[in-house]
Amino acid sequence: MTIWEISEKADYIAQRHRRLQDQWHIYCNSLVQGITLSKARLHHAMSCAPDKELCFVLFEHFRIYVTLADGFNSHTIEYYVETKDGEDKQRIAQAQLSIDGMIDGKVNIRDREQVLEHYLEKIAGVYDSLYTAIENNVPVNLSQLVKGQSPAA
């Protein structure tokens, strides 16, 4: 392979990598705007916004993380939950980000309402488990949130 062939491939790799990173940033912006501009009371608070992941505090007790999976050219978005004190961060869902700006092949990352709805579908099990625990006056176990199980009454 000549230096020019390698140069051409390197340019292609860099361009595609930049494009994927741009799509990730657009998704993050749409999700943050969707949450902050929503009239619904989701009890989400923005906690941190580093380059790699988003973090929201839920009910002042749980953290929800949204991040691109590790690895070069990863198209997998991962959703995690942990307690606010940092107990055992666990994945609750995944989605796929395409190079053309779609999530799971159906959600346009530029549409903040669609992005928010998709995100809420991914974390709905957390809300369901918390609701059931509160309704039945029982404590919440993080592993139950991850599995989407209702705490025992």
From Swiss-Prot:
<protein>
    <recommendedName>
        <fullName>Formate hydrogenlyase regulatory protein HycA</fullName>
    </recommendedName>
</protein>
<keyword id="KW-0804">Transcription</keyword>
<keyword id="KW-0805">Transcription regulation</keyword>
<dbReference type="InterPro" id="IPR021285">
    <property type="entry name" value="Tscrpt_reg_HycA"/>
</dbReference>
<dbReference type="Pfam" id="PF11046">
    <property type="entry name" value="HycA_repressor"/>
</dbReference>
<comment type="function">
    <text>Regulatory protein for the formate hydrogenlyase system. Could act by directly interacting with FhlA or by preventing the binding of FhlA to the upstream activatory sequence. Also down-regulates expression of the hyf operon.</text>
</comment>
